[in-house]
Amino acid sequence: MVGSTKFKAKEETWPFYISQFYYTVYTELQREIQQIKVWKYLGDEILLYVSIQDLGLDLDSRSSFLIKIPEKVYKVQSEAAKKIQEDLFMPELEVKSTVWIAGVQTIWSYENKKLDKNYQNIIATIDMEAKGETENKTENGAKDRDDFLGPDMDIGFRVAKFAFHHKVVLSADFAYLLHEIPTKIKDEEIDYKIDYKIDDDLQIVSYEILKGVWNEQYYPIVWYFPDWKSKDLLFFYDDHKKNPIVDRVLSGRIDPIDKLTQVYKELGKTKEIDAFVNECISCLKQ
């Protein structure tokens, strides 16, 4: 939720609306993605996660579901924003969302200081009972709390800076994965049935330097929106005054998602990203 500081300053009943926002987003996302879980709450942000291995019973259903995650997030984001405006009519309050992906490994022992070369991110499990916090159990009653740490986690927070209302911003790796899934699976001669091609809904709207990401090389900012041809639906009348990216979009200075192939190639990252995509598909098969 964006703009909540001003809202809290002038609205005495803000705790009710913030709590309602938490509840609405979580319950609606869980309705769309049953396996989703709360990672943590950060102020007016809700961080949630899902393992791609939990998305279905077979490769076809998991792959189809994965490709539709941006659509599902967009749906919930739009519904939450609509409810806020119906209840409060405060244009300065906006709902924004970011989706990214990372390969992680669980750290069972802190004696081994080296990570698996395929994973630069970890699941750090905190024993809540050892910390004297047994009352703060997770939603499934477990006594441990998981946190996700690593450079790919940081990328998600950096990319979130470019989130925009009525759009979903995706990390480049996640966008590339969604673009590649149909081709990769067909290459393996698997009968892949999907009636939805996400490429038309993803656009590279800008290239930005993100602190600590890609050695300060320009990073592609990807937005999801289901109807790029309808300019009247894309933005509010004054959005171009608030965000320079809007001008780029309206003037057509955007790139199709398959441009990512060239980006990774020119940065020498093709081998790395293809290995990641193959690893993700292996997880989808399990």
Q: Can you say where each PLM-predicted feature lies in the sequence?
A:
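Catalytic beta-strand-to-alpha-helix segment of the class III nucleotidyl cyclase homology domain
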Residues: 53-203
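Generic surface-pattern signal
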Residues: 27-31, 71, 75-86, 251, ...
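Intrinsically disordered, glycine/charged-rich C-terminal tails and inter-domain linkers
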Residues: 129-146, 154-286
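Catalytic NTP-binding/metal-coordinating core of nucleotidyl cyclase/transferase enzymes
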Residues: 1-76
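Low-complexity, intrinsically disordered regions enriched in charged/polar residues
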Residues: 12, 19, 23, 104, ...
